[in-house]
């Protein structure tokens, strides 16, 4: 099977490496091919591209029916507008909400391909590239297309589960980033694992409230794309969102160019009428209207209520 992977950041490179090793005919498109020095992505150091993986900066070389779009959510609309790619199926690998339109990734990709899907779930690029066991969700409104993608994109170490709840899968991946920022801040401030556990539980309740209000199914949020991804990113410094929250609490900075999707999502939620106290606090903390002590006080001073 031919497969195009658009975007040579950490996740795109990880997927391209995994699928090339699994025997697929993979073409990896990079915006800056010259930056891929030494046969690897600078965003995923130590993981060399296998023989047979085609790397290009020319979109016209990407002719597969299925394209995995592994670019940040905030870059998707601009990429689609430029044209040059016309797959039959465009699979988003981004986890966010577009700040200009408020749309999820698959809605942005609808102008690119007649069929869209969302690949999401608990996964770090390095684990995928190393061939470590990973389970993901492939969400597609068309059940037959979803099943076909599941069969085509599952490997001995990468297991895919299907759902038709695209909204739930997209929002699970986007919202958990916000909670991961908060979890990073909790650990960076030295508040302990008990506080982090409480945050994860209340954060999951916040995710579920928001997502179901937008039409998601509750059971989707309890699956890989919601709870599974939340547990992973709130518990590991491999998560960029977790590291960002940690840096907010300690006064450190992340490397220039680090993508933090959860920051944009937090701002979207803070501007919405939904009850999202954790997202509101993360947005205020990131924007400097609250410091870490003020953020903690803000959350702990909320009215007591039943769980």
Curated annotation (Swiss-Prot):
The keyword Lipid metabolism applies. Sn-glycerol 3-phosphate binds at residues 95, 121, 123, 176, 229, 239-241. Its EC number is 1.1.1.94. Pfam families: NAD_Gly3P_dh_C, NAD_Gly3P_dh_N. InterPro entries: 6-PGluconate_DH-like_C_sf, 6PGD_dom2, G3P_DH_NAD-dep, G3P_DH_NAD-dep_C, G3P_DH_NAD-dep_N, NAD(P)-bd_dom_sf. The active site is at 176 (proton acceptor). One of its GO terms (biological process) is glycerol-3-phosphate biosynthetic process. NADPH binds at residues 11, 31, 95, 125, 240, 261. It is found in: Cytoplasm. GO terms for cellular component: cytosol. HAMAP family: NAD_Glyc3P_dehydrog. Belongs to the NAD-dependent glycerol-3-phosphate dehydrogenase family. This is Glycerol-3-phosphate dehydrogenase [NAD(P)+]. The lineage of its organism: Bacteria, Pseudomonadati, Pseudomonadota, Alphaproteobacteria, Rhodobacterales. The gene is gpsA.
């Amino acid at each position: 099977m031919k497969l195009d992977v658009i975007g040579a950041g950490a996740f795109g490179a990880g997927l391209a490496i995994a699928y090339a090793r699994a025997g697929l005919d993979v073409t990896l498109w990079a915006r800056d091919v010259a930056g891929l020095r030494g046969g690897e992505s600078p965003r995923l150091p130590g993981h060399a591209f296998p023989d047979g993986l085609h790397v290009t900066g020319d979109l016209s070389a990407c002719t597969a029916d299925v394209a995995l779009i592994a670019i940040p959510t905030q870059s998707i609309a601009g990429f689609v507008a430029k044209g040059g790619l016309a797959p039959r199926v465009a699979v988003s690998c981004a986890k966010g909400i577009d700040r200009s339109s408020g749309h999820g990734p698959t809605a942005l990709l609808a102008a690119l391909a007649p069929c869209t899907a969302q690949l999401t779930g608990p996964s770090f690029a390095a684990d995928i590239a190393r061939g470590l066991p990973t389970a993901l969700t492939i969400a597609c409104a068309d059940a037959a297309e979803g099943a076909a993608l599941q069969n085509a994109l599952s490997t001995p170490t990468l297991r895919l589960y299907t759902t038709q709840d695209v909204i739930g899968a997209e929002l699970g991946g986007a919202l958990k980033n916000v909670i991961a920022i908060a979890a990073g801040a909790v650990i960076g401030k030295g508040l302990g694992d008990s506080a982090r556990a409480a945050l994860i539980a209340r954060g999951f309740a916040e995710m579920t409230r928001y997502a179901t209000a937008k039409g998601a199914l509750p059971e989707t949020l309890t699956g890989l794309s919601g709870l599974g991804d939340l547990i992973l990113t709130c518990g590991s410094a491999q998560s960029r969102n977790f590291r960002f929250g940690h840096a907010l609490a300690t006064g450190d900075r992340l490397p220039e160019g680090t993508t933090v999707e959860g920051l944009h999502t937090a701002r979207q939620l803070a501007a919405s009428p939904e009850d999202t106290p954790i997202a509101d606090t993360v947005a205020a903390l990131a924007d400097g209207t609250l410091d870490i002590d003020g953020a903690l006080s803000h959350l702990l001073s909320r009215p007591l209520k039943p769980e």
